[in-house]
């Protein structure tokens, strides 16, 4: 009996030891790729959960904050050795390298270094894949990436094993390669890996050398990792037909300038012209788009027909080409109205709708969806059709806290869709669209925006706010509503709100008087 108990205790001890070792390995992973500070051995459960959520977001996984099976499997996959979170990103919250990490020249040279001790990757393989990657990247911007025989080319690619001198970053068994930002430009390929000479990785264990080289060249050009699995800058070499996404192209052009192309210019002009026509002829919208007045900074206390969204514990208010931030209790104006491009670089305007989806902000402009984390776009813009909505634009979007976690709904006309949380909000639920009259028959006609306050949906029509009461069996308008939007603005002087509220009351009084006169006569 004693022997049996002794054996059980030994097994339990080994299992606990194995579990601790696994956790240590996963902590080292998070430290290696920038999610945790190296050397921090006293981690709180909250900081570890936050690090896991950030890692999961960059890996395209559900952000559980837990070391679940899918997360562990992703950590075990071959990947690039470059950190996912740079030091400058920790301080600035940016997802891409800042502009100083780029080449200033229009002609960027590269060289292929003799492999030396390599037994798997030949110099010809490196030259061929570098030429292919350089040609592809060069097509995206006003820059030429060319092989050169000069003594010190700007980029240098070589292959090596665990300790590859003079690099101080050691390869491990799961690292395919790593590279360094300008003006270092070094690209190192792990010679221990058996690479396939294909254009993309077709299956696990057959990593494409070209895919890896194209990715590492992106780092050598100044770009960080992207959470978009379709992007060339996705950190994990997953079997897929990767491509240069719209965000990859946008970043390349923003760093190195766009190529002058008559065809592209004509196409862009045609798109702009069509967009102008679309916006001018939309008569079924619930709000009027301003044109000449867009350049005038709006009065935050007298705004009309804005788009309001709750994001990161505060409210964003969009109006034409402007945006400002308000505290979650509506009492403080955090920043006054600034151009949208100043707060969200690259975001077009005016916007149609906005909603928080997980940790991201989704902004709808025409048929495009811009996904923002912090104040920067995290991947290429989506189209409405990408998530299963075949419309040219949407009217409004909101989070509904009737569910836990909150559900995300998108409206257009008399139909609405729900994002499918099982698909990580990448598609709408296949049971939709549905008619708004099914559950929302009491919503007033002509609403143009929606936001969440005190976990209840608030709908905007003009300057009127309708609070929907989800605690009742029938979703109707809460008692005491509608109210003027300005009644929420605790940051405005009292006389500003009085003027606006009295204007609304005055209009209601006139309307009531006319109604009474009609009934009398």
Curated annotation (Swiss-Prot):
The gene is zmp-1. It holds the Pfam family PG_binding_1. Glycans are attached at residues 199, 469. PANTHER family: MATRIX METALLOPROTEINASE, MATRIX METALLOPROTEINASE 1, ISOFORM C-RELATED. Belongs to the peptidase M10A family. Residues 259-298 are annotated as: Disordered. Residues 1-21 form the signal peptide. InterPro entries: Hemopexin-like_dom, Hemopexin-like_dom_sf, Hemopexin-like_repeat, M10A_MMP, MetalloPept_cat_dom_sf, Pept_M10_metallopeptidase, Pept_M10A, Pept_M10A_Zn_BS. Disruption phenotype: No defect in anchor cell invasion. In 7 percent of cdh-3 and zmp-1 double mutants and in 25 percent of cdh-3, him-4 and zmp-1 triple mutants, anchor cell invasion is delayed. One of its GO terms (molecular function) is zinc ion binding. Its cofactor is Zn(2+). One of its GO terms (biological process) is proteolysis. It comes from the Eukaryota. This is Matrix metalloproteinase-A. The conserved cysteine present in the cysteine-switch motif binds the catalytic zinc ion, thus inhibiting the enzyme. The dissociation of the cysteine from the zinc ion upon the activation-peptide release activates the enzyme. It comes from Caenorhabditis elegans.
């Amino acid at each position: 009996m004693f022997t049996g108990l002794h054996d059980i205790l030994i097994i339990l001890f080994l299992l606990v030891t194995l579990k601790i070792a696994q956790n240590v390995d996963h902590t080292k992973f998070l430290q290696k790729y920038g999610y945790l500070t190296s050397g921090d051995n006293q981690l709180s459960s909250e900081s570890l959960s936050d690090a896991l959520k950030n890692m999961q977001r960059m890996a395209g996984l559900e952000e559980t904050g837990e070391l679940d099976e899918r997360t562990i499997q992703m950590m075990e996959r071959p990947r690039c050795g470059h950190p996912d979170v740079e030091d400058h990103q920790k301080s600035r919250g940016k997802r891409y390298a800042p502009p100083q990490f780029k080449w200033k020249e229009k002609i960027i040279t590269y060289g292929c270094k003799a492999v030396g001790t390599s037994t798997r990757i030949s110099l010809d393989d490196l030259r061929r894949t570098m030429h292919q990657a350089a040609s592809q990247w060069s097509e995206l911007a006003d820059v030429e990436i060319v092989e050169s025989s000069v003594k010190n080319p700007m980029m240098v690619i070589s292959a090596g094993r665990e300790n590859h001198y003079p690099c101080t970053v050691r390869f491990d068994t799961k690292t395919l390669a790593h590279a360094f930002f300008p003006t270092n430009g070094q690209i190192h390929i792990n010679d221990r890996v058996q690479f396939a000479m294909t254009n993309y990785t077709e299956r696990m264990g057959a990593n494409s050398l070209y895919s890896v080289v194209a990715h590492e060249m992106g780092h050598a050009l100044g770009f960080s990792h992207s959470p978009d699995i379709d992007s060339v800058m996705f950190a994990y070499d997953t079997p897929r037909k990767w491509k240069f996404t719209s965000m990859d192209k946008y970043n390349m052009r923003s760093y190195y300038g766009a190529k002058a192309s008559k065809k592209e210019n004509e196409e862009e002009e045609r798109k702009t012209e069509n967009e102008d026509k679309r916006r001018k002829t939309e008569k079924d919208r619930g709000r009027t788009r301003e044109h000449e007045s867009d350049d005038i900074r709006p009065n935050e206390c007298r705004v009309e027909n804005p788009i309001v969204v709750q994001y990161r514990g505060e409210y964003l208010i969009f109006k034409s080409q402007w945006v400002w931030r308000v505290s979650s209790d509506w009492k403080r104006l955090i920043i006054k109205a600034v151009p949208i491009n100043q707060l969200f670089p690259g975001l077009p305007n005016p916007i149609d709708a906005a909603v928080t989806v997980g940790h991201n902000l989704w902004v709808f402009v025409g048929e495009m969806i811009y996904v923002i984390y912090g104040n920067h776009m995290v991947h290429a813009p989506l189209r409405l059709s990408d998530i299963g909505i075949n419309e040219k634009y949407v009217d409004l979007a909101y989070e509904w806290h009737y569910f836990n976690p909150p559900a995300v709904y998108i409206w257009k006309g008399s139909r609405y869709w729900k994002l499918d949380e099982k698909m990580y909000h990448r598609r709408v639920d296949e049971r939709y669209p549905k008619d708004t009259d099914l559950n929302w028959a009491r919503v007033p006609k002509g609403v143009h925006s929606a936001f969440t306050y005190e976990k209840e949906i608030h709908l905007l029509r003009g300057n009127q706010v309708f609070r929907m009461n989800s605690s009742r069996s029938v979703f109707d308008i809460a008692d005491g509503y509608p109210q003027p939007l300005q009644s929420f603005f605790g940051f405005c002087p009292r006389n500003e709100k009085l003027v606006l509220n009295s204007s609304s009351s005055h209009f209601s009084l006139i309307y009531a008087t006319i109604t009474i006169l009609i009934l009398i006569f």
